[in-house]
Amino acid sequence: RPPPSGRRQAHRPRPTVTRAGVPVVVMGVDVDLEAIANLPKGTEHFLADIHGEYQAFQHVLKNASGNIKRKVNELFGDTLRSTEKRELCTLIYYPEQKLALVKREEKDIKDWYHITIYRLVEVCRDVSSKYTRSKVRKALPVDFSYIIQELLHEHADDKDKTDYISAIISTIISTRRADDFIIAICEVIQRLVIDQLHILGDVYDRGPGAHIVMDTLKAYHTWDITWGNHDVLWMGAYAGNDACICNVIRIALRYANMTTIEDGYGINLIQLATFAMDAYADDPCEEFMPKVSKDNPLDERSKTLTAQMHKAISIMQFKIESQIISRHPEWKMDDRRLLNSIDYKKGTIKINGKEYTMRSCNFPTIDPKNPDKLT
């Protein structure tokens, strides 16, 4: 009701009552936001030029480019030997594999569990210190959320607290959940040590696992990307651009790495292989031999087939690109139409007004009168 005088009283801001899930506003100020603004800035992780090297990428994510090692050194300093700190870091990076090794070698596994869990809690407490309790809680696995929260927020300042923490850890061990708990808290550390991941171009290229990198990113908590030229090339191939498709396959064949195309995306290249073996049956295709790494050796027969496929797709790419350039004279890229600059009888090519002898002039799929025409 209005006051007896008939005048309305001016509205005066009052402190709100704290309610679950509702921001606390005092005199127009959001207390939660003000508090969050005063927290240390979360660690941002920048990675560039992955080029499909998924194993190196996953390892860098797990160790946060050395950030976990640095925190372990800061926390334990001279209280742990260098070997102990290295083993703790390895456990955080690869908990399942390290646990399997420890269980084969450790004589007193219960004692090891107790000491290790205590150390992992210390690391987790440190990496979570930049965040609100709400944000940390959302990062915790459901099975161990309550236990991890209790361990993180209880400090062993007195005997009662020490006994409480020790009892929690002992219960984890006695109920045979130690392995599961260690794996869970190691994954929490990996997640909290990096607040935001920034990918600076080229997930795709010559490496064998660009698709695995993308699957890893899909499962990552928060990231953004600046696409690189190779990424855009793959997008063009996905969109159906013939020149991009040829270029993607050519690069893969150049490095003898068909894993992403064949295994990652299930694209069968049998037709290309059949065509290449027929068209270049008597051609060693030495100029198109793949760049083979020591980790991915090929026998001579496979190298020859890959070189034939490499040459076949390269000629297709040159033809298609030349067709595109001819349709767009405004681009002023006629100098890139190299198939039209070849004298197929003499075996020479003219570039910038100068004539060069070609190392090979075996082009059975090219019509000298119409070099851009696909067969």
Each PLM stretch: what is its role?
Residues R1-T375:
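Feature recognizes metal-dependent phosphohydrolase scaffolds
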